[in-house]
Amino acid sequence: QERVADLLNTVGLNPRVGRRYSYEFSGGQRQRISIARALAVEPDFIVADEPISALDVNIQAQIINLMLDLQEKYGLTYLFIAHDLAVVRHISDRVVVLYLGKVMEIAPADQLFDRPLHPYTRYLLSAVPIPDAVVERERGYLKLDGEPPSSIEPPSGCRFRTRCPLAKEICASVPPPLVEHAPGHVAACHFAGQLQ
């Protein structure tokens, strides 16, 4: 019971809540309990799959800050799986972009967000709202054409080719390898960095 109390305290919950039933907790409290459960085995590595997706914005910020504090305190490494790119940018050191189960790009977070090389990454980032209304109005959006292909029967070659404006014949026949374009920055595209 002492260990449970310590873990609950570590994630910002009063140890007395340990006697409650699960339905008595809010979403944020449940997430804190999930984090405490993960910490119970004293891990070095935690997989966090959409850890804040079902929470309101204030609680999201609290959970992200808790995760960052715990990372610093315990030297944790996270595999943070998320679709909220603003949060990904805030919490990540390195980012991997996937499309239909294949790696499109891997880079240090700052490089990926400032200088994306893969067309899919460029499209993803162009969809992220910018809080500055003037900048938001003036920036150009990249619009994807076509329908996403089937993940059960993905296209040959590059999986993004059916929606990519740079696609050529080679993209259908030769899956692009991950190629390093800058230190630690790799992209799987025959025409990486060419989308304007």
PLM ranges: what are they?
Residues Y21-F25, Q29:
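Conserved ABC ATPase signature
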Residues Q1-R16, R122-S126:
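Conserved ABC ATPase "signature" region
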Residues P108-Q196:
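Charged, flexible cofactor/metal-binding loops and thiol motifs
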Residues E42:
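Conserved catalytic motifs of ABC-family nucleotide-binding domains
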Residues V47-P51, L55-R137:
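P-loop NTP-binding/switch modules centered on Walker-like glycine-rich loops
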Residues Q29-R32, A36, A61, P149, ...:
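Conserved ABC ATPase nucleotide-binding domain "signature" region
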Residues E2, R19-Y21, R139:
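Interfacial catalytic loop of ABC nucleotide-binding domains
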